[in-house]
Structure formats: C-alpha cells, structure tokens
C-alpha cells in the first residue's frame, strides 16, 4: 500500500467533462460503428487527445493490444459531471444501439457488468485486479441472475424509466 500513484489517476481528466461531452462521445462511438475491442488507433478516433488515449489505454488495456470500449465508455459516463439521472440516461443510451428507447436483458447484463467493473477498477486502480475480484466473487453470475429475475432472460422492452427504477432498487450507489 502507498507504493505509487494509482493508475485510476489516469482517468481524472474525465471528471472535468460535461455531460454533453460524454453523450457526444457515446454517440460518436455508435456513429463510427467501432468494435467492442478498441485498438489504440481506434481509441484515438474517439478521444482525439493522444496523451489522454495513452493514459486510458494504459489503465484499461495494460499490456493488451485492445481495451474494452464499453468498460471505457461506462467509466467516462460515471466519472463525468452530471446528476445521477443524467448518468443513468447516458449509460442507458450507450446500450440502446438500435435507438428505440429500449434495451434487452442481455444488453442490461453487459451494461451492469461494465459499470460494476468500472467502479471496481477505479477503486482498485487496476482493471485486471477488478476482473480477478469479480471472478472470485461470481459477480457476473450474480448480475445476470438479478437482471433475469427482474426482467426475464428474454426481456426485450426495458425502457429508460424501468432501468432507472432497477438501478435504484439494485445499485443505488449511482444516486
């Protein structure tokens, strides 16, 4: 403990972002039709600031050649300015790929996993440590069960309002 600066400091610039910048970033990700695993070059397409991309890449990818776009986008959505409702709306819209105002259970499960991993990674200062902690504690399985119990395994019509209620019931730390 105390042997160095946490890598989560690499994400500090995002705490200065306004909510509109986050929503614009999320929309750009969709408009560019980028993959879920981003190379450093693809991440530069999104963020444009090469110094920030290097920090983000170091935090999320470590020694890997790609980073999880969804984990990065969820982290940015959580760290940037805005109210709890604005954060929820940003997260929901990030996973509403068809732009119909609804997500399905599978998308909600992935979103929740990404959000929990983002929280843990920032707290632990390391994505790999967060992944290990999640595996050890069967977090992904618990999230899947929670979502499926609420919406059913084939839930297709989860609206923003349903999502907000779900977050308050299950994950009210966004409040």
Residue ranges, per PLM feature:
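Context-dependent free N-terminus signature
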Residues: 2-3
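EF-hand and EF-hand-like helix-loop-helix modules
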Residues: 25, 39-43, 53-58, 69-74, ...
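Eukaryotic helix-linker segments that join adjacent hydrophobic helices
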Residues: 6-76
């Amino acid at each position: 403990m105390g042997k160095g600066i946490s890598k989560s400091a690499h994400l500090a610039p995002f705490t200065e972002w306004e909510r509109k910048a986050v929503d614009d970033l999320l929309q750009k990700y969709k408009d560019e039709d980028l993959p879920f695993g981003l190379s450093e070059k693809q991440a530069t397409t999104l963020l444009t600031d090469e110094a920030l991309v290097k920090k983000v890449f170091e935090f999320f990818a470590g020694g890997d050649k790609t980073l999880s776009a969804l984990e990065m986008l969820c982290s940015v959505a959580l760290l940037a300015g805005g109210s709890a409702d604005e954060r929820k709306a940003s997260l929901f819209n990030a996973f509403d790929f068809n732009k119909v105002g609804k997500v399905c259970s599978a998308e909600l499960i992935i979103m929740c996993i990404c959000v929990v991993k983002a929280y843990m990674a920032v707290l632990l200062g390391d994505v790999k440590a967060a992944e290990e902690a999640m595996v050890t504690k069967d977090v992904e399985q618990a999230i899947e069960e929670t979502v499926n119990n609420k919406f059913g395994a084939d839930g297709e019509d989860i609206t923003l309002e349903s999502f907000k209620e779900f977050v308050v019931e299950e994950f009210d730390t966004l409040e």
